[in-house]
């Protein structure tokens, strides 16, 4: 079934910033039908690309009930707990995830690379064995956004949807792309030449490929639902002009708030809206 929520834009505010500064995300989204229950937003910092044990939920917020229309709010969260991150993964590239759920069902997962590096050249060239957190800067790479969507049941009447593979977006395995021919000997010779070239270039590392693999591991480990990955260009890149008089919804990080108490969201953070 079609999603009832479209993420129009997520803007990372105060970016770049120092590592110890708060994360601030301005989120604009559309609701196509009235949602009687809350949307649950969750910001996660991936402490290591090798294990989900180091993932940290920085903060979460409940937004709702939500009337039909376009809405905007600012979601802020504290920086990650440095003691829960492996020392070797503090400086370098990590991942920031924004998840959204409805009725405890995750329907979208957005991910960005995060580059953590020292601000002083001397520390960049000779990094200390124990990272100096107060000297670290943080930059969320907003130009490289990854989005994973999942089909969910928006109402009790909705059937349980089975993920359907889109041939246009299918990622083929390398074996699927091999040409079919009967020249077995020529294939063997070509494979040997390829192996020689790979050995000659073994010391060359494609950092982009390494970073992409790290983010892919983080996104794949977040939810094992077998859903397809696709990009929503209109959600990631569209510039949004928000009217000052648009209707808003109530945000609460602890408890749900009735629709009658909803307030406009413009220019407010999630913490400021909690009564």
Swiss-Prot record:
Q: Which UniProt keywords apply?
A: Chaperone, Chromatin regulator, Nucleus, Transcription, Transcription regulation
Q: Which GO terms describe its biological process?
A: DNA replication-dependent chromatin assembly; egg-laying behavior; nucleosome assembly; nucleosome disassembly; post-embryonic development
Quote the Gene3D superfamilies the UniProt record gives.
Answer: Histone chaperone ASF1-like
- UniProt lists compositionally biased (Acidic residues) regions at 157-166, 183-207, 230-247
**Is Nucleus one of the keywords UniProt gives this record?**
yes
Pfam families per the record? ASF1_hist_chap
Name a GO molecular-function annotation. histone binding
Region (Disordered): which ranges?
Answer: 157-275
Q: Does the keyword Ligase apply?
A: no
Segments of skewed composition (Basic and acidic residues): 265-275
Q: List cellular component terms (GO).
A: chromatin; nucleus
Which family, according to UniProt?
Belongs to the ASF1 family.
Instruction: Kindly state the subunit structure of this protein.
Output: Interacts with histone H3 and histone H4.
Give the protein's biological function: Histone chaperone that facilitates histone deposition and histone exchange and removal during nucleosome assembly and disassembly.
Q: What is this protein called?
A: Probable histone chaperone asf-1
Query: Which species expresses this protein natively?
Result: Caenorhabditis elegans
């Amino acid at each position: 079934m079609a999603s009832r929520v479209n993420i129009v834009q997520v803007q990372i505010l105060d970016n770049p910033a120092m590592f110890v500064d708060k994360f601030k995300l301005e989120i604009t989204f559309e609701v196509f039908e009235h949602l009687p229950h809350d949307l649950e937003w969750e910001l996660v910092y991936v402490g290591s690309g090798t294990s989900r044990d180091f993932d940290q939920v920085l903060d979460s917020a409940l937004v709702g009930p939500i009337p039909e229309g376009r809405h905007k709010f600012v979601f802020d969260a504290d920086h990650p707990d440095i003691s829960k991150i492996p020392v070797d993964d503090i400086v370098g590239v990590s991942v920031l995830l924004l998840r959204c759920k409805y009725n405890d069902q995750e329907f979208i997962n957005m991910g960005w690379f995060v580059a953590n590096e020292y601000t002083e050249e001397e520390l960049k060239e000779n990094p200390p064995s124990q990272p100096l957190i107060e000297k670290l800067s943080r930059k969320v790479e907003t130009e490289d956004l990854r989005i994973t969507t999942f089909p969910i049941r928006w109402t009790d009447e909705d059937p349980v949807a089975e993920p359907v593979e889109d041939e246009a977006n299918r990622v083929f395995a390398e074996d699927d792309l091999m040409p079919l021919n009967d020249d077995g000997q020529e294939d063997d010779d070509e494979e040997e030449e390829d192996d020689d070239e790979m050995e000659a270039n073994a010391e060359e590392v494609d950092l982009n490929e390494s970073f992409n693999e790290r983010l892919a591991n983080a996104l794949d480990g977040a939810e094992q639902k077998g859903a397809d990955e696709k990009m929503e260009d209109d959600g990631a890149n569209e510039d949004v002009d928000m009217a000052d008089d648009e209707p808003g919804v109530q945000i609460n990080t602890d408890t749900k708030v009735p629709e009658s108490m909803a307030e406009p969201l413009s220019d407010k953070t999630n913490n400021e809206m909690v009564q």
